[in-house]
Amino acid sequence: MKIILFNIIAVYYSLSFNSSLHDFSVPVMEGGNRSLSVYSNKKVMIVTLPLQQTASADSMLYSLDTLATAHIYNLKIIAVPSVEDGYTSEQKNDLMQWYRSKLDTNILITDGLYTHKSSGNQQHPLFNWLTNDNNNGIFNVDADSPGFKYVCNSAGKLYAVLNQHTKMHGSFVQKVLKAQ
C-alpha cells in the first residue's frame, strides 16, 4: 500500500510541473538563438562539452557524433561548452572549428553557457531547469564537469541524467534512449 501511494504521489508530483525543455532557447555558437520548441516530438540529449583538445576529448566528440548519426530521426543532441569548465569568448572560434571538425551540423552547439549550480543567478535558465528538481520535478544533479548528459523525452520532460563516466557508445545509453 505504501509503495502504491508513493508511486501515485511521484507521478502526480512529476505531472504537476508545467515547464519543459521546449520552453527554453539557447544562444548558438555560430550566431543567433534557437528555441528548443523546434525539437518537440524528438528526444533531446544535452551534453556538456570538453574544452581541451585531447585524445579522450576527441574520442568523446566522435562518440557523440556517432550517436547522433545513429539516431538522426528521433534524437537531437545539444552540445554545450560550459563557462565554469573554462569556456571564454576568446576561445570561441578555435573551439567552433574543433567541434565542427568532429561533430556534424545536425548537432546543435550552443555558445558558452553557465551550467553549474554554483553560478547562482548567472546559471543559464535551461541548466537551472535541468539541474534542479524543484524545476524539473525529478532530478537534482549538477553538471559539474564536461560529459554530463541530460535526456528529455519527446514531450520535453527530463527522464535521465548520465554522468561524465557514462560512455556514449555504451549499451546503457542505448537502453536510456529506448526508454520513454
Enumerate the language-model features and the residues they cover.
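Thiol-/selenol-based redox modules, centered on thioredoxin-like
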Residues: 125-128, 132-180
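Sec-dependent N-terminal signal peptides
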Residues: 3-13
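Short active-site neighborhood of thiol/selenol oxidoreductases, capturing the structured segment around
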Residues: 37-60, 77-80
